[in-house]
Amino acid sequence: CKGKGASCRRTSYDCCTGSCRLGRC
C-alpha cells in the first residue's frame, strides 16, 4: 500500500477499502 496515499491530500489511504479515509487498517 505504498505510494497510493500520495493522491489522498487531507485524508490518508486506507488499505482495507482501497480509498481515501481518515484512518488506517
From Swiss-Prot:
Its main location: secreted. The modification Cysteine amide is found at residue 25. Disulfide bonds join 1-16, 8-20, 15-25. Transmembrane segments: none annotated. One of its GO terms (cellular component) is extracellular region. One of its GO terms (molecular function) is calcium channel regulator activity. It is found in: Secreted. Keywords: Amidation, Calcium channel impairing toxin, Disulfide bond, Ion channel impairing toxin, Knottin, Secreted, Toxin, Voltage-gated calcium channel impairing toxin. Expressed by the venom duct. The keyword Disulfide bond applies. PROSITE patterns: OMEGA_CONOTOXIN. InterPro entries: Conotoxin_omega-typ_CS. Belongs to the conotoxin O1 superfamily. The presence of a 'disulfide through disulfide knot' structurally defines this protein as a knottin. Negative results: does not show effect on Cav1.2/CACNA1C, Cav1.3/CACNA1D, and Cav2.3/CACNA1E and shows a very little inhibition on Cav2.1/CACNA1A. Omega-conotoxins act at presynaptic membranes, they bind and block voltage-gated calcium channels. This toxin blocks N-type calcium channels (Cav2.2/CACNA1B). It shows a higher potency when Cav2.2/CACNA1B is only expressed with the ancillary subunit CACNB3 (IC(50)=0.1 nM) than on Cav2.2/CACNA1B expressed with the ancillary subunits CACNA2D1 and CACNB3 (IC(50)=19.9 nM). The Cav2.2/CACNA1B block by this toxin is voltage-independent, whereas the recovery from toxin block is voltage-dependent. This is Omega conotoxin-CVIF.
